[in-house]
Amino acid sequence: MKFIIKLFPEITIKSQSVRLRFIKILTGNIRNVLKPYDETLAVVRHWDNIEVRAKDESKRAAIVAELTRIPGIHHILAVEDRPYTDVHHIFEQTLEMNRERIEGKTFCVRVKRRGKHEFSSQDVERYVGGGLNQHVASAQVQLNRPQVTVNLEIEDERLILVTARYEGIGGYPIGTQEDVLSLISGGFDSGVSSYMLMRRGCRVHYCFFNLGGAAHEIGVRQVAHYLWKRYGSTHRVRFVAINFEPVVGEILEKVDDGQMGVVLKRMMVRAASKIAERYGVQALVTGEALGQVSSQTLTNLRLIDNASDTLILRPLISHDKEHIIKLAREIGTEDFARTMPEYCGVISKSPTVKAVKAKIEHEEQNFDFAILERMVEEATNVDIREIAEKAQEEVAEVETVASFSHNDVILDIRSNDEQEARPLEVEGVVVKSLPFYKLATQFGDLDQSKSWLLYCERGVMSRLQALYLHEQGFKNVKVYRP
């Protein structure tokens, strides 16, 4: 099978040297993501597209799913590469491929041609379109907004028949821009803002301020790992966790109620800036949107920025909440966010919307900055690929099994598209489906007299979810690793 990868249009208008660099990076990213699916897979770069060739037809759906999530790809064409002798031969092959597809529908033919030929692209469009119209009585030519567009590409003596088109997410390939550090809370905003910077070509590292204990960190790890695995797995990234409970305690004790929200955000920016400096990261990313909460007025945002010299990027600054939730739904983080606790909003009962710099600085004089320094020094730094190993250490009390008894039920917690692409079939045991993002709210509805064996392909999500469910009091949970 063969796919032609079309580049994000902004890549094609770059200078020759920049364009070649972007294409080279994108080619490497594609190869890194797809190699586990097919060792014989070939990725070949050209000036205006990238070819992907694979032999294992059973992996087609999985390969397509991965390609649609790699930044830098505008769309993917599944194609069949055939020789041809003349224009009539092109028509015959097109009719064979598209007869059923255009029956009872309006259609048009679009041709792209490269090389020297005795005919033009328009000649082929007219000939093939007219022939299809004659041989498929129920079909009708319609050049504007047809129901079906028959796409053909001709390269020298090769005919490329497009069998399917899949839309990519666009953007720049990850690695073409510098690294950023996302302040992730697990909510709607931080997940979407992280995705938007990945889509713009940045390698996104994650910094989490833990205000709610182990369960909160587990939940945020799941979000970060999901975003990385789905959109950024071409590169290694860090997940840094900072215990901020002592900092919050100091603020509650030493800072005036109305100033707490802004002071807390300034402390977060200071801490994140130190982490960014430690690892050579150029900018911070937050999910703040103008006016969404009291700390996100222009006056307060400016004061928050003044806490550090590090550049702060706010990709959602002009987005409303409805649009942010829609984006979260599209990228798959909505269900995470809906079950994630929010702690920052409850720190102050009557927060100021227009903080005064002198007053904020006066309140911060009462703060013991040694606490902040200590928390930054004690921050944990994990390669996001090692989250599975760290989860394994933390869920030692959660049993991992490869076989099952009469009371066991396997619970496939993979996302719906993964289950459709690679269905789980195990003889001798019932297999049920409940995507991981629904476990927090729906696991309690399952038959608790059964022993539930959580399954995911790599064991990362199943271990994290098993730990979370154990902490919620569900002891009838194990991890299934065949």
Swiss-Prot record:
SUPFAM superfamilies registered for this protein in UniProt: Adenine nucleotide alpha hydrolases-like, Rhodanese/Cell cycle control phosphatase, THUMP domain-like
UniProt key word Transferase: yes
Residues at the active site: 456
Enzyme class per UniProt: transferase
Any Pfam family matching the protein: ThiI
GO CC terms, sorted: cytosol
Disulfide bonds: 344-456
Keyword tags: ATP-binding, Cytoplasm, Disulfide bond, Nucleotide-binding, Redox-active center, RNA-binding, Thiamine biosynthesis, Transferase, tRNA-binding
Domain THUMP stretches: 61-165
UniProt cross-references to SMART domains, sorted A to Z: THUMP (SM00981)
Cell compartments where the protein resides: Cytoplasm
Rhodanese domain location: 404-482
Substrates-to-products reaction catalysed: [ThiI sulfur-carrier protein]-S-sulfanyl-L-cysteine + a uridine in tRNA + 2 reduced [2Fe-2S]-[ferredoxin] + ATP + H(+) = [ThiI sulfur-carrier protein]-L-cysteine + a 4-thiouridine in tRNA + 2 oxidized [2Fe-2S]-[ferredoxin] + AMP + diphosphate; [ThiS sulfur-carrier protein]-C-terminal Gly-Gly-AMP + S-sulfanyl-L-cysteinyl-[cysteine desulfurase] + AH2 = [ThiS sulfur-carrier protein]-C-terminal-Gly-aminoethanethioate + L-cysteinyl-[cysteine desulfurase] + A + AMP + 2 H(+)
Signal peptide residues on this chain, from the entry's feature table: none
Gene Ontology MF: a single term: tRNA-uracil-4 sulfurtransferase activity
Pathway: Cofactor biosynthesis; thiamine diphosphate biosynthesis
Annotated GO biological process: thiamine biosynthetic process; thiamine diphosphate biosynthetic process; thiazole biosynthetic process; tRNA 4-thiouridine biosynthesis
Top-level taxon of origin: Bacteria
Enzyme Commission number, as recorded: 2.8.1.4
Role this protein plays: Catalyzes the ATP-dependent transfer of a sulfur to tRNA to produce 4-thiouridine in position 8 of tRNAs, which functions as a near-UV photosensor. Also catalyzes the transfer of sulfur to the sulfur carrier protein ThiS, forming ThiS-thiocarboxylate. This is a step in the synthesis of thiazole, in the thiamine biosynthesis pathway. The sulfur is donated as persulfide by IscS.
UniProt similarity note: Belongs to the ThiI family.
PANTHER family assigned: TRNA SULFURTRANSFERASE
The name this protein goes by in its record: tRNA sulfurtransferase
Source organism of the structure: Erwinia tasmaniensis (strain DSM 17950 / CFBP 7177 / CIP 109463 / NCPPB 4357 / Et1/99)
Protein's gene: thiI
